[in-house]
Each structure stands twice: as structure tokens, then as C-alpha cells.
Design a protein with these regions (language model features):
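Long, low-complexity serine/threonine/glycine- and acidic-rich segments characteristic of extracellular
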Residues: 530-645
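Short acidic, glycine-rich surface-loop motifs adjacent to enzyme active sites
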Residues: 287-325, 348
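Secretory targeting signatures
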Residues: 1-29, 640-707
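Autoinhibitory N-terminal propeptides
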Residues: 16-108, 113-158, 636-637
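Subtilisin-like serine protease catalytic core
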Residues: 158-281, 304-309, 340, 364-367, ...
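Extracellular S/T/G-rich loop segment that most often corresponds to the catalytic His/Ser-adjacent loop
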Residues: 193-199, 363-463, 467
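C-terminal subdomain of the subtilisin-like protease fold in secreted/lumenal serine endopeptidases
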Residues: 308-310, 414, 467-541, 555
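Secreted peptidase-domain scaffold signal
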Residues: 55-71, 295, 350, 508-563
Length: 707
């Protein structure tokens, strides 16, 4: 009887605690309390030149060079730092050192005869002789369509959660220069650099003794491409009269680092100069300058504008290799290095359409955020959006490292078709970097299309994410963009990832959810620098309400790209308390990338009134968290929080305990009277009342579940 009585007490005590956190009411055969067993995968540490597929016979020469005859642009990649001895040796052999790219241990030699590649491959330290690629520029509705700016169709957007619309975030627009005199780009300039002039001897460089490398030079845009792209990232929408046109970028208050790597002619390599300009070398030099200056304290600006946060690239480099780039060429690797240095890279996927032969360099970078383009049909509504006919499709060429996720490009897509452009000085008269122009009276006109124009819109979203959470790491930013994007199309490789699609990547960028996730992580003090991004835990969009009403049943899917998932948890109180989910029963052991489902339920009536966040995460064996996924729901307000539920449980518990003790005392007294009629139970001195069973504080309780 005593055992039965204790059980009743416990049931009455725990009943209120399970009001918000509960488990699905399916049979035990459908769900298990034990997470499926998983086998981890260990990626071997192998040097990139030993697995790249761009050198199939492992002779340290790009395959396309072996049959090429005549002059060709050549770069050498070393397996270590490039030393003075290396450059002196090359010069003694008659080669001109065009540039040393320290970030990827490379030397650019310019145009040489292709017959020399065999001897160059034998030099000490050289691990790859690479062919220069050719630079190609990829080039109203957009901002609200990606859910950055509010509209009647989508009132809840990224700008709802951004107090300053990107203020204090620096975007390095690496392009043909930006005319920041434009009224929508005025006062955005923080620093600039002209890689074209720095490397080459055009007439103005000869006269000026080359331009400044300290960030003080402000390039002009004699092409239009760079100004248009910066406008889509951060134009304020103002015209020369100070009136708002509505043509804002996604982060109107973000600032500009103006890095000119493109010629006025766009694709080069000539810019109507007397001497040819090699665009490839300028591109590599410009990105190296960004890495070198990622933390620079720019003179004359507030401390909040020091350094470089984002690198926006609306162009690509052809690889000349069959099947495109595998991401191991030096121009893709330098973007990896920029990412690892803390600069978030947003790069265009390319405009080669559905029949593209792989992706070009830059867009093939394993660590960058590669952006494809959608056609928004000139409507804000996203339901009618489709992949743009010109947008390059994935996957990227396999690089041979046994990691299929690297080949999943593009990462995301955004509106890139028929976009209004900010006018550069070239649109209203002659101007270039020899003859200064003025775009102060220019406006917004001329629609353009391309992954060039989708990319800066995403760069602006990234600026908003950094604004609300400055601690975000570049790879965490990429993971947030992937996980919050609107899924488009069926999974192209479901055996490796449940969502990635070869046209859309992980989906159409959702500005609101990306910025809100970034803000929420900051509010609940979840740092992303030590997150395990290999753990994939996602809610599915098929939540339902049970027959009882007010109970949401959540279903999700999970897998791992390497490490083992030890548990999956959910929280309804901002991560203060976590509850384990139920799992799909699985026979045997799951290998890497194999997925399983999970489920849990939440009683919405017992959540605080108003919006509530339901968050879910995975945990590995070291206790490290995955990126969170979430859903927002409206609570019924019948119970404020889980802590309040605990307080109610404590009151009920004390009441039950008091009643139980009284009944038990009467029962003992009666029993004693029957068996020992003259014996009385007398409490010891100083104990006039029965002590409380627990301290008067918030009860730290554990939810009891039925296995």
C-alpha cells in the first residue's frame, strides 16, 4: 500500500511538468527512445595535389596543358611557402615573376610557351603547373523577393530584425570598380584598391608611380558591372533629389571596400591601353590584398568599420579542363583561404545554363557560398519562382577527396533576372580609371540578369546576419543560409543529403529566417565557432495537430556527414531546458549520410501567450551542438513557462505529501492501536511540525517518459 501511495504522489507531481513537453502518442513499435547506432567516417588528411582530378596522371601538370601548343598563362603552385630562392631560380631561368600569391603558395609567371611546363613541373617544391583561367563577369522586385525588405506579400522579413540594416559591416565588392558618388552609394566608401593598376603598366600608373596599396585609392567604374552589383547589395535607393526610389539593396547601410580587378572592357584582357592587361593576375592579387587587410584599421573611419567582413564576387574563371573545376585550382583555393581567415565569401555559380560542363573556378570553391539565380517572374511572390534558364547547374566536378558534400554546388539561389541597376558614370558620359567621371546625378535604370546579380543580394543578407550576430563564423553563416532556405525541387542526391538540389542548391534564400536564426543564436548565447556542422538535424514541414487539439506533433530528419549523433533534443524555453526526442527504429548500424526520422510533440496551450520558439539540435559524443533548426508557434498562455510548471508541480507535490503524511499517520496510529493499544508515538523534542520534503525553490525535475 505504501508503494502504491508513493506512485500516486509522483504521478500527481509530474503531471503539470509534461504539459508543454510531451512525446508523440504513437505506438512503441513506431518510435523508440534509443537513437540509431551510427558509424563515423574519418576523412584522411591527403594533400590536394594527390587527389585532384585535374591532374589525372599525377605528373604535377594540369591535364589541359599537356596537349596545348603555343603561348599560355601559367601559374605554379608549391607544396610549401614560396621563398626568395624559388623566385630567384625562376628569374635565373628567364621567367618574369608577375606576382606571388602567398595565400595559396603560388607564383604567377604570365604568358610563356607551353613547352616549358614540363621543366617547370620538375622544380623543387612545385606540386602543380596550372593554366590561367579567363575571367568572365556574370552579369525593385529582388530585395522583397528574397525576404530582405518588407512588402504587402511578405510583411515579416529580415529588416524586421535588423536595427541598422547592415551598418558597420564592410562588403568588399571585387569587380570593375564602384562609382560610390552615385546618390544611392554615397558615403559608403571605406577603403579601396586597384589590382589592375598595381600589377600593370597602364599610362596612368606610369604617371603616378602606381596607385596606392594602403586602401586610400578609390576606383571608378568604367564598365557598369561593379556599380550595379554594389547597388543590389547595399544601395539606399535614394536618387539625386534625395527621394526614395524603392531600389534598395538588401543591406542599405552596409559599407564598401572597393577592389577593382576588372577592366573597363569587362572580360579583358585589353582595356584600350597600349599594353595588354592580364585580368587573371589582377583577380588573384586583389583577393590576396583582401586577405592581407581583413583586420586593417582603415584611417579616418570609426572602429566599427575596420577590416573586411564579406567578399562578393560576381564573376568566375574558366578552368579549361573537361568537366570544369574540381575546386582545387589556385583561384578556388584562395577563396577557401579567405573563408578560413574569417572573410565570408559569396560567389556567383555562373551563367552556363543547364547544359554546363561542370562549374568554373571561384564558384567551385569548397568553402565559399556559391549562388545560383532564379527568375522571380517580376513578382514578389515566391511561389512562381523558377530556376533561371542561364544559371549554371551542379554538381561541381568531383575533386577525389571522398567527400560528396564538397561537390554540392550551388549552395543557394536568389533572384537574379531582370533586375534594375544603379547607374555608373559610364552610362551618362565617358569615364574610366584614366578619366574620372561623376555618377552623382545618376539614378537606377536598365534591367540586367545573371548570377552576377543574385550574388550581391545574398551578400547583403550576409551583412544583416553579421550585424545582428558579429560572432558568426563564415562556415556557420553558410550553414544558416542552407538550412533556412526555402526548399525547391526534389533532392538530387538523397543518399547524401535530404534537401540539396542540383538547380537550386539547398533552396531559395530566405532573408527573414537567416537573419532571425542569427539573431536568436546571439540572444540565447549559442556560439557557432565550436558547433559541429557535420551534424544535420532538421524539422520537416509536416507538423500536425492531434485530435485533442493544441498539440503539435513535430517530425524531423537527421543524419551526419562524419561524426556520430549521440542524441537529439528540443526546447520550448530558449534552450534553458532540453528534452530528448523519440527516434525511428532502425535495424543495424547507419553509415555516414544515412538518415533517420525523429518525432516529439508540444502542447501549444501550455506555452506562454504569443510567439514561441521550438528549437531542435543534435549533440555529438563531446557534447558539441549542431546548428539549430526551429519553428515559431503561438502559445495558448495557460501555463507561462516550464519553470512555472515546476512551481505548480511543487505546490501540488507539497499538498499531496502533506495529505499523504496525515493519512499515513492516521493509518499507522490505527494500526498501532490495534496491535499495541497502550503504545503512543511521540515526536522528539523540537520537532513540532513535519519538515518540508523539498526546499522552497524552483524544482529541478526530470520528465518521466514511457519507453
Amino acid at each position: 500500500m505504501r508503494a502504491h501511495f508513493a506512485l500516486i504522489c509522483l504521478v500527481l507531481f509530474f503531471a503539470p511538468l509534461t504539459g508543454s513537453l510531451s512525446q508523440p502518442e504513437q505506438s512503441e513499435s513506431q518510435w523508440s527512445s534509443v537513437i540509431p547506432t551510427m558509424t563515423p567516417v574519418v576523412h584522411q588528411e591527403v594533400d590536394w595535389w594527390d587527389y585532384t582530378t585535374m591532374d589525372s596522371n599525377r605528373n604535377a601538370i594540369h591535364d589541359s596543358l599537356e596537349t596545348l601548343q603555343g603561348p599560355v598563362g601559367i601559374g605554379l603552385s608549391y607544396g610549401r611557402d614560396v621563398t626568395d630562392i624559388d623566385t630567384q631560380l625562376l628569374e635565373s631561368l628567364g621567367y618574369e615573376i608577375r606576382d606571388v600569391i602567398e595565400a595559396v603558395d603560388a607564383v604567377l609567371l604570365g604568358i610563356i610557351d607551353s613547352s616549358n611546363v614540363w621543366n617547370l613541373s620538375q622544380l623543387d617544391g612545385v606540386v602543380m603547373v596550372e593554366r590561367y583561367g579567363q575571367i568572365i563577369l556574370y552579369g525593385d522586385i529582388q530585395t522583397p523577393n528574397i525576404l530582405a525588405e518588407q512588402s504587402d506579400v511578405y510583411p515579416h522579413t529580415a529588416w524586421n530584425h535588423s536595427e541598422t540594416l547592415g551598418l558597420g559591416v564592410n562588403i568588399a565588392m571585387v569587380d570593375t570598380g564602384v562609382d560610390n558618388e552615385h546618390p544611392g552609394l554615397n558615403e559608403k566608401f571605406v577603403a579601396g584598391y586597384d589590382a589592375v593598376c598595381y600589377l600593370h603598366t597602364d599610362p596612368s600608373c606610369i604617371l603616378s608611380g602606381a596607385r596606392e596599396t594602403d586602401g586610400s585609392f578609390d576606383p571608378d567604374d568604367g564598365n557598369q558591372h561593379g556599380t550595379a552589383c554594389m547597388g543590389m547589395a547595399s544601395a539606399t535607393g535614394l536618387d539625386s533629389n534625395g527621394e526614395q526610389t524603392g531600389f534598395e539593396g538588401s543591406a542599405p547601410n552596409a559599407s564598401l571596400i572597393d577592389v577593382r580587378i576588372g577592366t573597363d572592357a569587362g572580360a579583358g584582357p585589353f582595356e584600350n591601353y597600349l599594353i595588354p592587361q592580364e585580368f587573371y593576375e589582377s583577380a588573384m592579387n586583389g583577393i590576396q590584398w583582401i586577405i592581407d587587410n581583413k583586420d586593417t584599421a582603415w584611417p579616418g573611419v570609426d572602429e566599427s568599420l575596420y577590416g573586411i567582413d564579406i567578399l562578393s564576387l560576381s564573376w568566375g574563371i574558366t578552368s579549361h579542363e573537361t568537366g570544369g573545376s574540381d575546386g582545387e585550382d589556385m583561384h578556388s583555393r584562395i577563396l577557401n583561404e579567405a573563408t578560413l581567415a574569417g572573410v565570408t565569401v559569396s560567389v556567383a555559380a555562373g551563367n552556363d545554363g543547364p547544359s554546363n560542363d561542370g562549374l568554373s573556378g571561384m564558384g567551385s570553391s569548397s568553402l565559399s557560398i556559391t549562388v545560383g539565380a532564379t527568375d522571380d517572374m517580376n513578382t514578389i511572390e515566391r511561389d512562381d519562382d523558377d530556376i533561371a534558364s542561364y544559371s549554371s547547374r551542379g554538381p561541381r566536378r568531383d575533386n577525389g577527396d571522398s567527400n560528396p558534400i564538397n561537390e554540392m554546388k550551388p549552395d543557394v539561389t536568389a533572384s537574379g533576372s531582370n533586375i534594375i541597376q544603379a547607374e555608373a558614370c559610364v552610362t551618362t558620359g565617358g569615364c574610366n580609371n584614366l578619366i574620372n567621371g561623376d555618377a552623382a546625378d545618376n539614378g537606377y535604370t536598365g534591367r540586367g540578369s545573371g548570377t552576377s546579380y543574385a550574388t550581391p543580394a545574398v551578400s547583403g543578407i550576409i551583412a544583416l546576419m553579421i550585424e545582428v550576430n558579429p560572432e558568426l563564423e563564415p562556415l556557420a553563416i553558410r550553414e544558416i543560409l542552407r538550412s533556412t532556405s526555402t526548399r525547391m525541387g526534389e533532392a538530387s542526391q538523397p543518399e547524401h543529403d535530404a534537401f540539396w538540389n542540383e538547380d537550386f542548391g539547398w533552396g531559395l534564400v530566405h532573408g527573414h529566417d537567416a537573419v532571425w536564426t542569427s539573431l536568436y543564436l546571439n540572444e540565447i548565447n549559442m556560439t557557432t565557432s565550436d558547433m559541429n556542422l557535420d551534424l544535420q538535424v532538421h524539422l520537416l514541414p509536416n507538423n500536425s495537430t492531434s485530435d485533442e487539439g493544441g498539440v503539435n506533433i513535430y517530425n524531423g530528419i537527421a543524419w551526419s556527414r562524419g561524426d556520430v549523433l549521440e542524441t537529439i533534443e528540443f526546447s520550448v524555453d530558449g534552450g534553458s531546458t532540453w528534452e530528448e526526442v523519440y527516434y525511428e527504429p532502425v535495424n543495424g548500424t547507419l553509415s555516414t549520410y544515412e538518415s533517420f526520422e525523429f518525432s516529439f510533440s508540444v502542447n501549444l496551450d501550455t506555452l506562454p501567450a504569443g510567439y514561441n520558439m521550438i528549437i531542435v539540435r543534435g549533440i555529438d559524443s563531446s557534447g558539441t551542438s549542431s546548428m539549430i533548426d526551429w519553428d515559431s508557434v503561438i502559445g495558448g498562455g495557460q501555463m507561462m513557462t516550464l519553470s512555472d510548471a515546476s512551481s505548480l508541480g511543487r505546490v501540488l507535490f507539497l499538498s499531496v505529501v502533506g495529505l499523504a503524511v496525515a493519512i499515513f499517520g492516521v493509518w499507522v496510529f490505527v494500526n498501532q492501536k490495534v496491535t499495541e493499544p497502550f503504545a503512543l508515538i511521540v515526536p522528539p523534542e523540537g520537532t513540532e511540525e513535519i519538515p518540508l520534503a523539498i526546499e522552497d525553490g524552483i524544482l529541478d525535475a526530470e520528465i518521466i517518459k514511457d519507453d
